[in-house]
């Protein structure tokens, strides 16, 4: 996980000067290029995950890609994303996890999983929307899954959350492809009208 985190962080930092050179940064983004990039990346990933979870039929929420019971079902993958969005965004906010003690991987229906996912993303949306480059570089206390206490940059934790969402979305894509369902990130994009 740490190699993935470092790769995402370095990719983020390298993308900023390139975006600035091509004129993609403007307004508030030019004052906060790191947090603007992260917010936009998170929102794109968030929307892709929600659309894919909505697109998967209810009967496939219990499927696994094989016979191994330790591999999460599609629904459990959705619940896993919700669990970690609550955990890491609560820590980034400096709040108690509003979902503490509840394992969203143990839900039963598509409607329950979608509600948990949307609630978790709604909770995180405020964290990402209020993030600035300055607030992102503040050191915060973090409790890891093992219970170990550590300190890290707020933005580092939110980059980890984004990267983890992306990692689990990769699993979701596999489940969808196994059922011959086109994931939302691969859907055809509407053609834009060309000026005449």
Where are these regions (language model features)?
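Bacterial N-terminal signal peptides
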Residues: 5-17
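Short N-terminal segments immediately surrounding and downstream of signal-peptide cleavage
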Residues: 23-47
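Short, contiguous alpha-helical
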Residues: 39, 43, 47-50, 61-102, ...
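Well-ordered alpha-helical scaffold segments within catalytic/enzyme domains
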Residues: 48, 52-53, 89, 123, ...
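Acidic/histidine-rich alpha-helical segments that form the ligand environment
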Residues: 106-143, 150-168
